[in-house]
Design a protein with these regions (language model features):
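Hydrophobic pocket/interface hotspot
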Residues: 30, 42-43, 50, 67, ...
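A short hydrophobic beta-strand element
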Residues: 97-107
Length: 162
C-alpha cells in the first residue's frame, strides 16, 4: 500500500513539474515571437472571452481589454511601440484547471546605438483554465516610466498603432 502511495505521489509531483516547465517554455517562446514582431502565438494563449487589465493610467497600454480582438489590439500596440519583453521569474499555484501564475516581466527599448531608452518591470497576474488565459492583470513597478515613454513616443509622432 505504501509503495503504491509513494508511486502515485511521485507521479503527481513529476507530472506537475513537467506541466509547469511546458507552460513556462511556451510562454518564453511566445514572448520571443512577440519580440520578433509576431503577436499571434501569444494571442493564441488567450481564450476568446479573456480579460486583460493593464492599469488605469495615462498611457496607451492602460485599460481593460475584453475578448481576443481587444487583446490583439493591445499586443499590436506593444509591438508597434518597439517594446521588448523578458521573463524574469514565474510562480505557479493551483490545479491545471484553475491555475494562477505570477510572472515578473521586464520591458525595454534599446536604441540603435545601444542606449536604453526605456526599462520597466511589471508583475503579470495570470489566471488560466487548462493552460488558456482567462484573465490577466498587469501591475507596473513604475507607472511614471510607462507614461513618460508613451509621451516620448507621441513626441516622435508615433500614435498608439505605430
Amino acid at each position: 500500500m505504501r509503495a503504491w502511495f509513494a508511486a502515485g505521489a511521485t507521479t503527481a509531483f513529476t507530472g506537475r513539474y513537467v506541466l509547469l516547465r511546458v507552460l513556462l517554455h511556451r510562454f518564453t517562446r511566445d514572448v520571443a515571437a512577440l519580440n520578433a514582431g509576431d503577436h499571434r502565438p501569444l494571442l493564441s494563449a488567450y481564450r476568446h472571452d479573456a480579460v486583460l487589465r493593464s492599469g488605469e493610467l495615462d498611457h496607451r497600454w492602460s485599460g481593460v481589454y475584453v475578448g481576443r480582438d481587444a487583446i490583439e489590439e493591445f499586443l499590436r500596440t506593444f509591438v508597434a511601440s518597439r517594446l521588448r519583453g523578458e521573463i524574469g521569474a514565474a510562480y505557479f499555484g493551483g490545479p491545471p484547471w484553475r491555475m494562477t501564475t505570477l510572472v515578473r516581466f521586464t520591458t525595454h527599448v534599446i536604441a540603435p546605438n545601444g542606449a536604453v531608452r526605456h526599462r520597466n518591470r511589471t508583475i503579470l497576474q495570470v489566471r488560466t483554465k487548462w493552460g488558456r488565459i482567462v484573465e490577466q492583470e498587469d501591475f507596473y513597478e513604475n507607472t511614471a516610466r510607462a507614461e513618460a515613454f508613451d509621451a516620448r513616443l507621441r513626441q516622435l509622432g508615433l500614435d498608439a498603432t505605430g
